[in-house]
Each structure stands twice: as structure tokens, then as C-alpha cells.
Amino acid sequence: MSKPPPKPVKPGQVKVFRALYTFEPRTPDELYFEEGDIIYITDMSDTNWWKGTCKGRTGLIPSNYVAEQAESIDNPLHEAAKRGNLSWLRECLDNRVGVNGLDKAGSTALYWACHGGHRDIVEMLFTQPNIELNQQNKLGDTALHAAAWKGYADIVQLLLEKGARTDLRNNEKKLALDMATNAACASLLKKKQGTDAVRSLSNAEDYLDDEDSD
């Protein structure tokens, strides 16, 4: 009886490594990669042979080689976002690296893309259907706080258009508006908060009208 196929890896469970040496396959099933290549391990169910992808090719790698001859990359999506490396970010997403993973600071890749002013990275992350806009890190800051603090009005606008919340306060009780370092960011945030306030008031009036009509 053949053993069942391994379960597909869930996003975020992919392990990512950077090869320290070139690996020459001995069989057609094995994966060739060179020193410095990024390897995405998608199946570790076999203790001796792991399934991995490198440069669009998939194959088997001896697990002991990865353990001894490769460097683990803990937060590859975050690293790509910080550097503004769009091709690496796209490769991470194509290989099912989790889009909402948190680093040691509790920040998402989106936070770092906004912090660095990398508009193309932000737009690429927005193509992911489950992207979390309002995740607060250990300081309580969101991606919107980061963009406002660094003065990237174009990214503030992108976040607001996507539906980012303006009412979240960080650990210092500051809104993104309080963190804004230029007039353009402050203006966008004030306008959005004003629109939200009017909408909330309108909803409250509609609710009261409904109560009166009962």
C-alpha cells in the first residue's frame, strides 16, 4: 500500500533558507542550487529528504545538507519589504510565505514596506486577499502610523483607500494623525477622520429615526 501524499503546506509554514554552498544532484529528483540561492522548503514530512523550490524548480534536498550547509531566513517577506526588493517579495508570495507573519517586533511585512516608503511593495502586498491592514506591533503602531511618521503621503493615501483604520492608538495613545510629520499626511488623515465622523453621526441618526418609527 503506497503512503498517502503529504498534506499541502499552509501559508506561513514554508521554511526559507539561503544556500551557503552549491549542491550537485545525484538523481533527477534532487534539486540543484548554487551558493547564495534562496530555497523554499515546502514539505518536511520525510526526515531524510525535504521537498524544496529554488528559482521555480522543485525537487528533493537531503535534510542534513539544509541543516548543516544552509542559513535559515526567519522573516524573508519582511526582509524583502524592508529592502524594497520586489522580485524577492513576489517570489516569497509565489512560494506561499505567509503575508501576515510577525517578526520579533510584532510587525508585518506591510508595516516595513510603509516604513521604508516602498510603494511598489505596498501595492504588491495589497494584491493578497487576506492582507491585514491594521495589525499593531509591540509598540502599538500600525502600517498607517509608520507611513504617517515617515511622511509618505502617497502610501498614507493607499492605506486609507484600502480601508485602514484611523482610530487606532499606539502604546503612547497616539493616532496616526498625531504621528504625521508633514502637512500632506496630516491633511489626508484629518479628511478621512472627518468623513468617518460624519458617517458615524449619519448612522446614529438613521438608527434613531428607525427607533422613532417603531
Curated annotation (Swiss-Prot):
List modified residues, type Phosphoserine. Answer: 202, 213
Keywords of the record: Acetylation, ANK repeat, Cytoplasm, Phosphoprotein, Repeat, SH3 domain
Q: Which GO terms describe its biological process?
A: signal transduction
Which residues carry the post-translational modification N-acetylserine, per the record? 2
Where does the record place the SH3 domain?
Answer: 12-71
Q: Where in the cell is it found?
A: Cytoplasm
Which segments carry the ANK repeats? 72-101, 105-135, 139-168
A GO cellular component term found in this entry reads: cytoplasm
- Pfam family of the protein (one): Ank
Which superkingdom?
Answer: Eukaryota
Q: What does this protein do?
A: Induces bone resorption, acting probably through a signaling cascade which results in the secretion of factor(s) enhancing osteoclast formation and activity.
**Subunit architecture:** Interacts with SRC and SMN1. Interacts with FASLG.
Comment text on domains: The SH3 domain mediates interaction with SMN1.
Write down what this protein is called: Osteoclast-stimulating factor 1
